[in-house]
């Protein structure tokens, strides 16, 4: 690339990075609001005497952790020099599949397939945390 276009390319990259950062900041604020709402919902479900409230509480807890993990992912993005570590996506995937198993556990075959997916994600996490692939 010629040196004439280098300042323009740098400006475009900086502008796009700024837009991305602002978008993620807005998303983080929205997720914090939803996390607060989920906290109130969990408190409401906790004191509900209905027999199904235990299932709703467990489901709400897993959703709570999903919000928490997405917020942690955004925080880690800013702390690690504007990149997303792969292992955080794996954590979110594992939590999402656990939530799916809790909500939809009618079919034993589906639960087995979901469990195999969790096993694959755990193996992926182990590989990502091994010394060969560790960057942080």
Curated annotation (Swiss-Prot):
One of the record's GO cellular component terms:
plasma membrane
Residue stretches spanning the membrane: 15-35, 58-78, 83-103, 108-128
BP terms from Gene Ontology? cellular response to phosphate starvation
Query: How would you describe this protein's topology in the membrane?
Result: Multi-pass membrane protein
Keyword Disulfide bond carried by entry: no
Q: Sorted alphabetically, which HAMAP family does this protein's record hold? A: PsiE
Q: What is this protein called?
A: Protein PsiE homolog
Record gene name: psiE
């Amino acid at each position: 690339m010629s040196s004439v276009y280098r300042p323009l390319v740098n400006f475009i990259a900086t502008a796009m990075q700024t837009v991305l950062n602002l978008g993620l900041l807005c998303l983080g604020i929205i997720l914090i609001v939803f996390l607060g709402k989920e906290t109130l919902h969990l408190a409401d479900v906790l004191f509900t005497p209905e027999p199904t409230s235990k299932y709703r509480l467990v489901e709400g807890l897993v959703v709570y952790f999903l919000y928490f993990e997405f917020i942690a992912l955004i925080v880690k993005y800013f702390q690690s020099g504007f990149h997303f570590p792969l292992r955080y996506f794996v954590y979110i995937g594992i939590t999402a599949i656990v939530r799916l198993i809790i909500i939809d556990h009618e079919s034993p075959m589906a639960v087995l397939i979901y469990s195999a997916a969790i096993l694959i994600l755990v193996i992926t996490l182990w590989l990502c945390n091994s010394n060969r692939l560790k960057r942080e």
